[in-house]
Every structure is written in C-alpha cells, then in structure tokens.
C-alpha cells in the first residue's frame, strides 16, 4: 500500500516562555500521522516559515517511505544549506517520517534502528548555584534523588550569572572576568570532591566562554578532579585548538551542541580530539543524519551524549532516548529534569513513557 503525505502542519507553543516547534505530517491513510521536533527556540518563526513556505509544497504527495531521498532532496534544494533554520525545519519532517514508519511497522524507533543495546539510559542533570555552597547542596539533593552523574556550575553556563566586580572607573554594562570564573570553578570542584569524594561523576560546561589559550590552561587545571567530561571549552569557530588541549591533559572532552554539519565534527572525531559528541539532534537535521554520525563515532571510539536541554520538545527528548537505546557507543544522556506546571486528568507520567 502506497501512503503519501497529505498535509504538513506546524505547531508552536511556549511553556515557561520557551519557544518550541513541532511538525506534524499527515498522510493519505486516515488517522496515520507523525510528529517531529523542529525547535530552534531563538528563531522559531524562521523555522515555521521554512516549513510552511518551502518544505510543505515539495512534500505534498511524496511517499512517506522515502525518508532518505526526501532528506537529501530538501538538504540540497535551497542550494545554500547547513544552517540552523533549514536543519531544524528538516528535522521536524524527518522525525515525523520516522514516526510514521514506526507506526506502519508496529515497531518503536529503537527497533527500526536495529534493536536495543541496553534496557535503560543513564542520565545526568544540572546543579547550578549562586554560590559554591549553594551548588554543593544542590548536588547533594540530586545525589539523594539517585543521580550518579551531575553537571555542576556556579552562576549557570560558564559562570554567566556569577557575581562579578566591574573594573574600577568602568562604564555601566556587562563585564565578564574569565580568570575569576576559572578560579571560582576550581574552588567549586575542590569542595565537591572534598564533600562527596569520588563516588559521584561530575561534569562542567564552559559554554564557550573562554579564549582558546585560557581553555588549554583550564582543562589542565581541571584534570585533577577526574571529570566525566568537560563540555564546550571552545567555540565551534576555534575547534582547531582541541589538539592543543588534548596534548596537555587527559580530561575527557565533550563538544557539539552548536554543530550544524559534518564539516564541524569530522576532524574532531577522526583525529580523536574529543571523547563525547554532544550535538542537538534537530540542529543537524534529525534522525537520518544522527544515524550516520553514531556509526562514524563508533568507528573512532567516540561516545554519544546528545544535547537534552529545556528548549527541546518532549518529542526531541524521546528521540534522544530511542537513539541511546539503539547505539552501541552510547555514553550518557543529558536530562534537564522536569517541571510539571499542570497535569491533565488521566495523563501518563513521564517516567512511564520512557
């Protein structure tokens, strides 16, 4: 039976003022549809326009089974490609088509991808404090909840909200002191190891807020804390510096949430300059390219740690989990935890879904 695409719709919502975008692909078979995550929270309206004005006219009438051909055609049809707007729009369609394929086959996504490699998915979450002691206490609370790997920060990502002292005589504005951030972070991890010993796995996210030369020093200084990984210590534009970091320390390195295309990750993987790939699935175009990235990483001993932030739809989180289940080189899954604002009668608890 040939099943074709009948309609493509975009659904936008903004829980807690976070712009989330979902694509719904409806088919010629009554009641058969698929959904996919297309969330680019900072430019969501551009993604909506890309789906409605450009992808939808092309997709109507296409066979839902031709996932690879549809993905390749959309990727190249705009000529200028590999940007976050088109990739997120493409992701919404791609995930929806995989969803349809799974429903037609009567199989979950992880079975379509080759079957389960594990029965559960280890996750890490975030502890962010305004002070060192605040963060230490939050790590303890998460430990009590059962987390065995925790990302710790003072002042949020890369210390962006950390108290600072503006330079004397400076103009009003925002100042960031990388040296103060580095020193405060080292103090934090000294306290964490002093308090919890080596029973916890710990991570840290620099969030690209260091100059390359400072990142080399910082990664070396963090080596003694035996991190599970140090995340995004460089911006994608400066990824050539990973070679210097690798030469100076053994701290495991994670990178990738801002990556859009293979040219950004290829050398890091084939040269084994990172340990974990951290891409945001919708940012690279969905499940179809993620499968290929998993296989590439597996060949070079790199493990996955997909980006799992709050600005991701539940569909995106579910896809992360399915890929984790089916990947032999799965490492760990970021989980931004849940914040239930309301619950409808009869709603299924999130832990029951996963």
Go through the PLM ranges and name each one.
Residues 1-40, 338-345:
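Structured beta-strand/loop patches that form or line metal/cofactor-binding pockets in enzymes
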Residues 120-248:
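Metal-dependent enolase-superfamily TIM-barrel catalytic cores that perform enediolate-based chemistry
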Residues 1-16, 103, 107-120:
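N-terminal amphipathic alpha-helix/helix-capping segment at the start of soluble metabolic enzymes
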Residues 5, 31, 55, 93, ...:
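Conserved, mostly hydrophobic/aromatic
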Residues 96-105, 136, 140-144:
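Alpha-helical scaffold segments that flank or form the walls of functional sites
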Residues 28, 32-104:
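Metal- or metallocofactor-binding catalytic centers and their adjacent structured scaffolds
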Residues 108, 122, 201, 252, ...:
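Proline-centered loop/turn at the N-terminus of a beta-strand
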Residues 25, 53, 69, 220, ...:
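Shared catalytic-loop signature of beta/alpha-barrel
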């Amino acid at each position: 039976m040939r099943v074709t695409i009948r309609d493509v719709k975009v659904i936008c919502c903004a829980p807690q003022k976070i712009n989330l975008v979902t694509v719904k692909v409806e088919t010629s078979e009554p009641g058969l549809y698929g959904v996919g995550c297309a969330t680019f929270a900072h430019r969501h309206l551009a993604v909506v326009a890309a789906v409605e004005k450009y992808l939808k006219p092309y997709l109507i009438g296409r066979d839902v089974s031709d996932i690879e051909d549809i993905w390749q055609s959309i990727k190249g049809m705009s000529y200028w490609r590999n940007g976050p707007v088109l990739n997120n729009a493409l992701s919404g369609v791609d995930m929806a088509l995989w969803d349809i394929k799974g429903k037609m086959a009567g199989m979950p996504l992880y079975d379509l991808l080759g079957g389960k490699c594990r029965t559960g998915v280890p996750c890490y979450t975030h502890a962010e404090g305004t002070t060192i002691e605040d963060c230490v206490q939050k790590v303890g609370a998460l430990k009590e909840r059962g987390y065995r790997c925790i990302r710790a920060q003072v002042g949020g990502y890369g210390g962006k909200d950390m108290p600072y002292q503006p330079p004397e005589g400076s103009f009003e504005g925002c100042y960031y002191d990388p040296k103060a951030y580095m020193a405060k972070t080292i103090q934090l991890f000294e306290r964490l190891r002093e308090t919890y010993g080596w029973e916890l796995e710990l991570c840290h996210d620099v969030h690209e807020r260091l100059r390359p030369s400072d990142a080399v020093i910082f990664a070396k200084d963090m080596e003694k804390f035996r991190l599970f990984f140090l995340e995004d210590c460089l911006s994608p534009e400066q990824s050539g510096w990973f070679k210097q970091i690798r030469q100076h320390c053994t701290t495991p390195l994670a990178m990738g949430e801002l990556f859009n295309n293979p040219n950004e990750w290829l050398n890091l993987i084939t040269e084994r300059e990172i340990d974990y790939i951290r891409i945001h699935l919708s940012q690279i175009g969905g499940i179809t390219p993620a499968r290929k990235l998993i296989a590439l990483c597996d060949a070079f001993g790199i493990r996955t740690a997909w980006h799992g932030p709050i600005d991701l739809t539940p569909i995106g989180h579910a896809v992360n989990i399915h890929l984790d289940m089916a990947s032999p080189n799965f490492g760990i899954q970021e989980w931004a935890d849940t914040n239930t604002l309301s619950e409808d009668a009869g709603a299924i608890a999130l832990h029951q879904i996963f």
